[in-house]
């Protein structure tokens, strides 16, 4: 997995191009990601970078740390970082680990393809029709109170039980969901906002993890190379 960033879902809108085409996009706010811990193979058994973002504050805007456990305070104190709104981890290669103390929105550019990981909206206890898209029974005369029933759940005497994993009614949503290969349409560095084509999981103000998609690695490398060439040309012209 490549290094990524943690952002906050703002909502959805649409972007209109010069030719009049409309693109639905998700808006993600990405504040500065501060590196809290660097994990190595020798110490932890794998290579990863742990980051945080934002600051816990009360309604008055004051730092809210009195309810933070001492162990968490000590964890942040090791790198002299301010206590954030959570901890997120990105698995990286050993050669990708640097001495940097933070990562910003400059990691992404328009044209990059990313994977977005978030927690889906909780729907509570739902029936088979909504949870698994089961077909409804007849809504006609003769069907009594069984319109949304799931039907048979198994055999009778043999095996005399319901098989594990049978699709039935139950809790729906509130689980980790990954949307892959979403294209970044626009990056607003001044406001720390990126616009990603399509929808992303989670509710408004929910946190999401964004990382470069390995399935589109060739395209991502070409985009990064073009940006570097443009920057080099600008330096030469100046």
UniProtKB/Swiss-Prot annotation:
UniProt-listed Pfam families:
Ribosomal_L3
For this record, the Gene Ontology CC terms, alphabetical, are:
cytosolic large ribosomal subunit
Which residue stretches, if any, does this entry annotate as coiled coil? none
User: Record's Gene3D superfamilies?
Assistant: 3.30.160.810, Translation factors (2.40.30.10)
Report keywords, A-Z.
Methylation, Ribonucleoprotein, Ribosomal protein, RNA-binding, rRNA-binding
Q: Where is the signal peptide?
A: none
Report if keyword GTP-binding is assigned. Answer: no
Q: Which GO terms describe its molecular function?
A: rRNA binding; structural constituent of ribosome
Name positions with the PTM N5-methylglutamine: 157
InterPro entries assigned: Ribosomal_uL3, Ribosomal_uL3_bac/org-type, Ribosomal_uL3_CS, Transl_B-barrel_sf
- Provide the record's note on post-translational modification: Methylated by PrmB.
Note whether Repressor occurs among the keywords. no
Give the function comment from the record.
Answer: One of the primary rRNA binding proteins, it binds directly near the 3'-end of the 23S rRNA, where it nucleates assembly of the 50S subunit.
User: How does this chain assemble?
Assistant: Part of the 50S ribosomal subunit. Forms a cluster with proteins L14 and L19.
Name of the protein: Large ribosomal subunit protein uL3
Q: Gene name?
A: rplC
